[in-house]
From Swiss-Prot:
Motif (Q motif): 32-60
Name of this protein: Eukaryotic initiation factor 4A-I
GO molecular function (one): translation initiation factor activity
UniProt keyword list: Acetylation, ATP-binding, Cell membrane, Cytoplasm, Helicase, Host-virus interaction, Hydrolase, Initiation factor, Isopeptide bond, Membrane, Nucleotide-binding, Phosphoprotein, Protein biosynthesis, RNA-binding, Ubl conjugation
Assembly with partners or alone: eIF4F is a multi-subunit complex, the composition of which varies with external and internal environmental conditions. It is composed of at least EIF4A, EIF4E and EIF4G1/EIF4G3. Interacts with PAIP1, EIF4E and UPF2. Found in a complex with XPO7, EIF4A1, ARHGAP1, VPS26A, VPS29, VPS35 and SFN. May interact with NOM1. Interacts with PDCD4; this interferes with the interaction between EIF4A and EIF4G. Interacts with RBM4. Interacts with DDX3X in an RNA-independent manner.
PTM sites of type N-acetylserine: S2
Gene: EIF4A1
The Helicase C-terminal domain, residue ranges: 245-406
Primary localisation category: cytoplasm
Region (Disordered): 1-21
Length: 406
């Protein structure tokens, strides 16, 4: 091996990696119509009733290998239709007559798990498939009863509660044939890696594994090596993904303490539709909410310290449009899927640039238009440039007529 080859293989990290944590596709088949995927009639009805007309880039590539039973690693960002990719694959594969759990989906947050459950139920509406969200913060006894009485076809959950139910044998792995890890980068970084591995040990060795992730840091790929067999790798490249359709601006606020006044000046603009404001810490979410209320601005807030009931009520009000401005943290960036949101404000720039797309990818899902406004202090300028470079995008200074763009 020559020296240049040697250094190249080192730079590339694990097999199937290109530099910069991007996987290399090894599957080129594209099916550009749902009708050509050999899906059941009742599932197709659900897909069209849900409002899908043509499969998105990830759906055109990943549904088929998933249905064929391959292990699949799919790299695609938020807003590309990846939830429906695995939901359709699961619904096509389950045996409706078998009253047993046959597919298990893990997600990093409760909100995301509930959202996935809603998508599965909607797509499977004409099939009579059952799907249950197995998440922390809910009544354990009621959950145990549901699992024992009904044995839902599909379980979507967070790692802690799912492991607990498997461990206590209320959830049986016997018929689980498909295991999906959604937002795998988020789950495998910190905390959940061990729990996922423990869950995996309880599943049958021939269980199909599907892993979806916006980013592919090397530790994610290392973990996939432990529990995936010759996976199909599918990359939906950044340019097919979606900062497209989202106008990105920054406001030069110079100093942190000037952000609040700037936000209040923007408030009238925010309430034209619905807006999400992202902040980096839970404490600061509470602080900003208090400050806004003290100035008689109506805002609602949500973060991980709140109990599940409270979070559900807040999300319900926001989804229905009765609350118009939601202040939240990155934890929930991946669980807010509200069609009407066309404005996202980064009160704080994300500490982790990968989260930028999760935050603003909300606004312009499937090519819907959206506006993102970043508040930038002197210290933030380098981070902003870094984000521009990372996503190969341009973020301009906010024009005075921003209200006309929303």
């Amino acid at each position: 091996m020559s020296a240049s080859q040697d250094s190249r293989s080192r730079d590339n990290g694990p097999d199937g990696m290109e530099p910069e944590g991007v996987i290399e596709s090894n599957w080129n088949e594209i099916v550009d119509s749902f009708d050509d995927m050999n899906l059941s009639e009742s599932l197709l009805r659900g897909i069209y009733a849900y409002g899908f007309e043509k499969p998105s880039a990830i759906q055109q590539r990943a549904i088929l290998p998933c249905i064929k039973g391959y292990d699949v690693i799919a790299q695609a960002q938020s807003g590309t239709g990846k939830t429906a990719t695995f939901a359709i694959s699961i619904l096509q594969q389950i045996e409706l007559d078998l009253k047993a759990t046959q597919a298990l989906v893990l997600a990093p947050t409760r909100e995301l798990a509930q959202q996935i459950q809603k998508v599965v139920m909607a797509l499977g509406d004409y099939m009579g498939a059952s799907c249950h969200a197995c998440i922390g913060g809910t009544n354990v006894r009621a959950e145990v009863q549901k699992l024992q009485m009904e044995a839902p076809h599909i379980i979507v959950g967070t790692p802690g509660r799912v492991f607990d139910m498997l461990n206590r044998r209320y959830l049986s792995p016997k018929y689980i044939k498909m295991f999906v890890l959604d937002e795998a980068d988020e789950m495998l970084s910190r905390g959940f890696k061990d729990q996922i591995y423990d869950i995996f040990q309880k599943l049958n060795s021939n269980t199909q594994v599907v892993l979806l992730s916006a980013t592919m840091p090397s530790d994610v790929l290392e973990v996939t090596k432990k529990f995936m067999r010759d996976p199909i790798r599918i990359l939906v490249k950044k340019e097919e993904l979606t900062l497209e359709g989202i106008r990105q601006f920054y406001i030069n606020v110079e100093r942190e303490e000037w952000k609040l006044d700037t936000l209040c000046d923007l408030y009238e603009t925010l309430t034209i539709t619905q807006a999400v404001i992202f902040i980096n810490t839970r404490r600061k979410v509470d602080w900003l909410t208090e400050k806004m209320h003290a100035r008689d601005f109506t805002v609602s807030a949500m973060h991980g310290d709140m109990d599940q009931k409270e979070r559900d009520v807040i999300m319900r009000e926001f989804r229905s449009g009765s609350s118009r401005v939601l202040i939240t943290t990155d934890l929930l960036a991946r669980g807010i899927d509200v069609q009407q949101v066309s404005l996202v404000i980064n009160y704080d720039l994300p500490t982790n640039r990968e989260n930028y797309i999760h935050r603003i990818g909300r606004g312009g899902r499937f090519g819907r238009k959206g506006v993102a406004i970043n508040m930038v202090t002197e210290e933030d300028k380098r981070t902003l440039r870094d984000i521009e470079t990372f996503y190969n995008t341009s973020i301009e200074e906010m024009p005075l007529n921003v209200a006309d763009l929303i």
